[in-house]
Amino acid sequence: VRATFIHGVRDVRTGEKAAPERTGDEVLIRVAGVGVCGSDLHYYLEGGIGSAHIHAPFIPGHEFAGWVTEDRPELGLHRGQLVAVDPARPCGHCEWCGRGHVNLCPNVVFTGAPPHHGAMTETIAVAPEQIFPVPEHFTVAQAVMLEPLGVAVHAMDLAKQRVLETVAVLGCGPIGLCLLQLARRAGAERVYAVDPCDYRAEAALRLGADRVDASHERIDEWTGGRGCDLVLEATNAPAGFQIAVDSAAIGGRVIMAGIPDGNAYHLDAAQVRRKGLVIKFVRRMGHVYPRAIKLVAAGGVDVESVVTHRFPLQEAGRAFELQTERRDGAIKSLIVPQERFE
């Protein structure tokens, strides 16, 4: 089968790999779409994230959906059914799984995170517990976007937003735009967004932001010097942590969902202490796919419009470059290994 491989920094090629064979109760999925995520860009530009280094050639891709290849009545699945796939397969037995923190499982098998190959291929085998059937009216894009939406839902669980709080969203990429919509839905009095990219700022306004600017310094002006009760950071900027702290009110909360370039932040620690901030970092997601599906099905979150570009498998390199350079209106690019189930 065909697959997209990262061979090195900014070196993406399409090639062949052995067709997957299912073992045990696994299900074979024909991949319908794979999102290019910010973490994929870190593998592409830096060869890894922190201590997680890829061993080239590496198949990326963890945001994906596809069609079931055969009837599996014992699982309630039928051939040709569109399903979303949770990339995480936690062990279910460790201390952290036992506490309900499956997203922190140290034994997790995570599709598309080293050393485990991802879904930018034509066919993949996954465990039944990773599969979430979607309503018949769902598009492939909506099914794929359940993964980044799930991360945003998990972030909001950590945030514990209260009604009529002021919220700042830093970074209006796919996860930032999902966070913005969730904050609005949760009853924020004002939602302010910050992004230096014009078309992302326009998307933020369209999806519910009250005000948007390229600089976080406008938040001080908009809030009369108070800052925001809740700051949702979703950038790749090493300055993102400091900007979030600057934007937060005394006693506020900061939720860090972004991954910085170079895997390092710079921070004025005294400012954090003096403001008495509560800071939480987002690690993937818990068991949130069912809620994410309900949100999209009910029209509570628009994920369809976040997907701006589609590329066939052999043009994955173009998608990576487009997202890296943030041009041509690219917010979320989708790699489409095949247009239809056959």
How does the language model describe each region?
Residues 5-21, 38-70, 84, 105-115:
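N-terminal glycine-rich cofactor-binding segment
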